[in-house]
Design a protein with these regions (language model features):
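Flexible gly/pro-rich beta->alpha loop and the following alpha-helix that scaffold active-site loops
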Residues: 19-85
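Catalytic nucleophile loop
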Residues: 78-101
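Acyltransferase
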Residues: 180-230
Length: 230
């Protein structure tokens, strides 16, 4: 049976809707909870794709998150061999590992439903071809990619974060969270949201109001990624 390796970097950043989309296609998730001490594999042998999830650390905060060197090594081993999807921290790991730059608490934070601009390069991308010029996604970050690797293609941007989605070969990184549903947004700490300048009630209401549109968009995009798995 086809299996996809998923690295979980934070107890609060689980795979969410990814598990449903995998199940719909008969693909088995192999989730490694690196934050809980589970060892990160040295290779993608036996796996058809690699997905790296989010987390509150920077991609090189090795003292805080001692599994990160192994995760970066795994990413290098997987790149060019199997399709890779990096989400939030996962996208930052992709950029950092291949020569880009990531800065902590850079610019203005993004939380909740956010409008993204789909850039011209996306029209030829196997995951994004046919999308409208703007789409909505759930965001939850303060850190961001400030310089792309030289061979990266920029696919999406937002007002507060220019580097929202990149591709290097068959490795994609998204700063946003396609896997997050309104249920998870409801669980976000309201005081934390207020401290970042957001109205917690408005953030939840937006996630609920746009739930169907978000699911339609990202189930299709992630579905295209999973169609590469084989």
């Amino acid at each position: 049976m086809t299996s996809v390796l998923i690295i979980e970097n934070d107890r609060d950043s689980g795979p969410g809707r990814l598990l449903d989309w995998l199940d719909e296609r008969g693909i088995t998730p192999a989730v490694v909870r690196a934050w809980d001490g589970e060892p990160v594999p040295a290779s993608v042998d036996g796996y058809a794709a690699l997905i790296l999830l989010g987390g509150g650390m920077l991609p090189d905060e090795d003292e805080r998150s001692p599994w990160l060197p192994a995760e970066r090594a795994l990413l290098r081993a997987a790149h060019g061999r199997v399709p890779v999807l990096g989400i939030c921290l996962g996208a930052q790991l992709l950029a950092h590992t291949f020569g880009g730059e990531v800065q902590g608490k850079y610019g203005q934070p993004e939380k909740g439903v956010t409008s993204l601009t789909v850039l011209p390069a996306a029209k030829d991308d196997v995951l994004l071809a046919g999308l409208p010029s703007t789409v909505l996604a759930v965001e939850s970050h303060q850190d961001q990619i400030t310089r792309l690797p030289d061979d990266a293609v920029l696919l999406m941007s937002s007002e507060r974060c220019p580097n929202q989605m990149l591709r290097i070969g068959q490795s994609w990184g998204v700063q946003f969270h396609p896997e997050v549903e309104a249920d998870r947004v409801r669980g976000w700490n309201p005081e934390r949201l207020r401290s970042l300048g957001f109205d917690p009630d408005a953030v939840v209401a937006d996630a609920e109001r746009h739930a169907a549109e978000l699911d339609k968009t990202w189930s299709a995009v992630v579905g295209r990624f999973l169609s590469l798995v084989g």
